[in-house]
Amino acid sequence: MPTQPILVASIADGTGKTAVTLALARLVQERDRRVGYMKPKGTRLQSSTGKTLDRDPMLARDLLGLDGEMHQLEPVVYSPTFVDSAIRGQEDPDELGDLVESQFRELATDTDLMLVEGGGDWTTGGIVDLTDVDVADRLDATVLLVAPYRTAEDLDNVLAAADAFGDRLAGVLFNDVSDAAFDELESDAVPFLERRGVPVVGVLPHDRDLAGVTVGDLTAELGADVLVGGDTDGHIERFLVGAMGGDAALRYFRRTKDAAVVTGGDRPEIVTAALEAPGVNAVILTGGHRPPAAVLGTAENRGVPVLLATGDTLSVVDRAESILESGRARDAGTVDRMRDLLYDHADVDAILSGDDAASDADE
């Protein structure tokens, strides 16, 4: 018999939920247990039409060697088209909930533990009664809540989610915690939550390998043209908009690291300033303009990639931020790194306690 499923929910999109879910699945497999995976609401789509699939279940199927079909792993494609249909009364919440349950039962066959990944944040799906709270109730799942932490004010959201999940909450896992916030979280915030009856099962530090996106991945996601090649493994954690004068831009750019500068191709002085800043790992040009050949030559000499993306600066920044905030687990390497972080900084036995009990019963 499978043990009680674990639903991995998150306070906000882009908190590393997919990496955590898949890393836990790998840990279960390393214990010689049979694991299953499901993401009831597909939210990370390649298009907004609902005709494409969520990338997370596709990655899960490949990494975990699962046999389930995509319509089982992701029964509800939560696209803008679907949302529009739902608010017009064209989607039946009861039928959708029953669909999730039936696909879950099929996937759970011959598994020891099912891991269920929430979609978006924990409130996503409310228009069709499929929030993570609703899904946990339907599947009788315990809940691991993945949360960010920057300041103590973030605890308001944690407490609200903990109250909504109630007794189903197995624990909170803080992820991607900066050095500046780490001590305060461990010394003050964690004891506060535990006094309020909210268990904390881990605090994972910021890890460069899991944050941001590589220049190569960003280029592919944006569909950008490469004007100047360079270090495609360069790391991007933030985007800076170049809209000021050259001198001011240089002072601005020098205060950052692991950044990409987004600016119009008709602003060569901004591009030049970006190329002089050691923390800028790429320049993204917009508006269909190319800078002078001399500027591109400087970029080539410095090994800084220069990309040309379709659209104006605002739209390109929005798309780039969306890529960055997806927090996606890109490959086996990122999942394995998350597994190591869980080993070092989380109580894995507490998270997987139901599966351990099942394993002991089988022996």
Name each model-derived stretch.
Residues 171, 175-271, 275, 328-363:
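C-terminal accessory "lid"/substrate-recognition subdomains
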Residues 5-8, 98-118, 241-245, 249-254, ...:
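P-loop NTP-binding module
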Residues 1-3, 363:
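Terminal disorder- and signal-encoded targeting elements
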Residues 5-7, 34-36, 58, 70-71, ...:
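Structural motif
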Residues 83-128, 133-137:
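Phosphate-binding/switch loop-helix module in NTP-utilizing enzymes
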Residues 5-15, 19-106, 181-183, 189-195:
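N-terminal phosphate/diphosphate-binding loop that engages ATP/GTP or pyrophosphate donors
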Residues 10-12, 24, 40-41, 55-56, ...:
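Fold-independent oxyanion-binding glycine-rich loops
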Residues 120-202, 266-303, 307-323, 327-329:
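Conserved catalytic-core segment of NTP-binding enzymes
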